[in-house]
């Protein structure tokens, strides 16, 4: 992790700080899926806004190997545990460790996947969160209006913000955080 850009260093340090405040024991591993590099770079090069962020994706341990083999899928196969799509079909991320830990299950080991996500021009949603009856955002409509992702702001019934990307080429894995109890 020595060759990080300053912004990426700040983001990973923020994640580490959150883990430490939760008194979590963890190890961070650097990961690179070469199959993600070219599509990710192409997606960014074709976008007006080049903005990316390091974001967290919580998943059960049983889903890690399939995700590493095939990448993070918007509609995963049945071999991967899949939960929620309150804001439409997409890959869901958070900037909050606690939010992402809620998706890791209750095993003694927990896994957080850290992705570089092209957020580009973000659609900011500040509406009321009403559980499974949430709004279904349409990626094609968002794209036609110049948006690349959705940032759902915390508040109005939602405790932590969420970021949704709608194209599998919008993200690439950078780190795996293994948490032990």
UniProtKB/Swiss-Prot annotation:
<dbReference type="GO" id="GO:0070212">
    <property type="term" value="P:protein poly-ADP-ribosylation"/>
</dbReference>
<keyword id="KW-0328">Glycosyltransferase</keyword>
<protein>
    <recommendedName>
        <fullName>Putative poly [ADP-ribose] polymerase-like 100L</fullName>
        <ecNumber>2.4.2.30</ecNumber>
    </recommendedName>
</protein>
<keyword id="KW-0808">Transferase</keyword>
<dbReference type="GO" id="GO:0006302">
    <property type="term" value="P:double-strand break repair"/>
</dbReference>
<keyword id="KW-0520">NAD</keyword>
<dbReference type="InterPro" id="IPR050800">
    <property type="entry name" value="ARTD/PARP"/>
</dbReference>
<dbReference type="Pfam" id="PF00644">
    <property type="entry name" value="PARP"/>
</dbReference>
<dbReference type="InterPro" id="IPR012317">
    <property type="entry name" value="Poly(ADP-ribose)pol_cat_dom"/>
</dbReference>
<dbReference type="GO" id="GO:1990404">
    <property type="term" value="F:NAD+-protein mono-ADP-ribosyltransferase activity"/>
</dbReference>
<feature type="domain" description="PARP catalytic">
    <location>
        <begin position="1"/>
        <end position="181"/>
    </location>
</feature>
<dbReference type="GO" id="GO:0003950">
    <property type="term" value="F:NAD+ poly-ADP-ribosyltransferase activity"/>
</dbReference>
């Amino acid at each position: 992790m020595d060759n990080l850009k300053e912004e990426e260093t700040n983001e990973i340090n923020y994640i580490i700080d959150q883990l430490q405040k939760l008194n979590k024991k963890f190890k961070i591993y650097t990961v690179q899926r070469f199959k993600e590099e070219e599509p990710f770079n192409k997606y960014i090069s074709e976008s007006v806004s080049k903005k990316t962020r390091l974001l967290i994706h919580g998943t059960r341990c049983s889903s890690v190997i399939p995700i590493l083999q095939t990448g993070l899928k918007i509609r995963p196969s049945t071999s991967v545990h899949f939960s929620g799509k309150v804001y439409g079909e997409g890959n869901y991320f958070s900037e909050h460790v606690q939010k992402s830990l809620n998706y890791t299950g209750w095993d003694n080991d927990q896994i957080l996947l850290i992705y570089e996500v092209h957020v580009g021009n973000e659609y900011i949603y500040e509406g009321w969160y009403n559980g499974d009856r949430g709004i279904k955002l349409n990626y094609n409509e968002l794209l036609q209006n110049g948006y690349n992702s959705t940032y759902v702001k915390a508040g109005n019934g939602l405790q932590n913000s969420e970021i949704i990307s709608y194209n599998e080429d919008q993200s690439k894995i950078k780190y795996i955080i293994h948490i032990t109890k």
